[in-house]
Amino acid sequence: MKLFKLAVVGFIILNYIALGCAKAPSQFSDAPSQSLSKFDQKLFARAALHQQKGQIDSAIVLWNKFLQRNPNSFEVRNNLGLLYYANDEIVKAIYHFGQGLKLRPREDQLKMNLVRALKVQSAILEENREYDEAIVDLSRIVQLSPAKEQEAIERQIEALEDQIFKQVKKSDSMGEYQEFLKKYPRSPGNSDEARLWIENKLQAKKMGNQELLSSDFQPSLATE
């Protein structure tokens, strides 16, 4: 567990180098794309300077202040996402990258940053055995990724579905089987097995009820 957490932290640090310190010009936005008032221009410049210097906390404060005045700035959403990512606040990073992508759906850099953050979060969720939540993140990654990368991610999802189904089989519960089918109706192999299990259980219950009715009926005939 400790080794995994260290690996995750190391993963985040390495990605921060890619996303922040050794960033390509398109990763960190140091100039606004829209026209701003002089006050907002100065505020943007101050926040950008703090981020460039690696002053994460103060940069976050300034960018949030700017965002209150300019909520539709996708550049600032991206910059905040990078800062929260570097600060190990993955949930907030995902939120801001996602909001930025809503404002600029075709912005590849935002997509890439969001995917990286989602990968970190899904890995943490998987380690914590929160498989359903990890699958939600991985499914989102599939939607954001190019076709050539989707198959590998879909295999990850299938592997997690296998883990969930193992737990379902251990439970031997009708409710658990039905819930699995509701969430994963097309899980390769697992969904068909779940349907068959439910069908057999219902059939056995039906036969049991018929036998019970038959046994109740026979004594009444004997009495007559």
Describe these PLM feature segments.
Residues 39-41, 74-75, 108, 115, ...:
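Helix-start (N-cap) detector for alpha-helical repeat units in TPR-like alpha-solenoids
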Residues 61, 65-68, 99-102, 143, ...:
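Conserved structural position within tetratricopeptide repeats
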Residues 79, 113, 120, 154-156, ...:
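Canonical tetratricopeptide repeat
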